[in-house]
Amino acid sequence: MRLHLITVGEPKLTYARLGWEEYEKRLRRYHKLQVTRVSGRTQAQESEAVRRAAGKAPLVLLDPRGRQFSSPDLSAYLDAQAVGGVGELAFAIGGPDGHTDELRSSAHLLWGLGQLTLPHDLAMVVLVEALYRASTISAGEPYHR
């Protein structure tokens, strides 16, 4: 399955950029991967850019109000999408103000990383690592212990 990762901006902090690059490289062993960086001056512009970037792919928005997954549950979700014929999933991290209500209501799924507020750069690393971990679980590999 193809994964399309959409972020508002790029990781600015060195640790986050290096973490993103490492897990992006690892994730490419399991999925075709597309990364799109979008921008906008307002929340509405950012959300519109995310919507355009996702195209027709089901859109999973990272949002604090969203469903929380354990790593095995995320793996099962990805597997179910693939078995169900979904060829591509788009995952999006919004800007500092999050996503608009309109984009949220049109999303395939809202995914919450937890109750903590994370810096944008760290959320990017958590996203790509979580997808990598879920992929190794699906492949029966020992990364997740």
From Swiss-Prot:
Record-level GO cellular component terms: cytoplasm
Taxonomic placement: Bacteria, Thermotogati, Deinococcota, Deinococci, Deinococcales
EC number: 2.1.1.177
Encoding gene, per UniProt annotation: rlmH
Superkingdom of source: Bacteria
Gene Ontology MF: a single term: rRNA (pseudouridine-N3-)-methyltransferase activity
Catalytic EC class: transferase
Alphabetized UniProt keyword annotations: Cytoplasm, Methyltransferase, rRNA processing, S-adenosyl-L-methionine, Transferase
Subunit note: Homodimer.
Protein name (record): Ribosomal RNA large subunit methyltransferase H
Chief localization: cytoplasm
Compartment annotation: Cytoplasm
Known role: Specifically methylates the pseudouridine at position 1915 (m3Psi1915) in 23S rRNA.
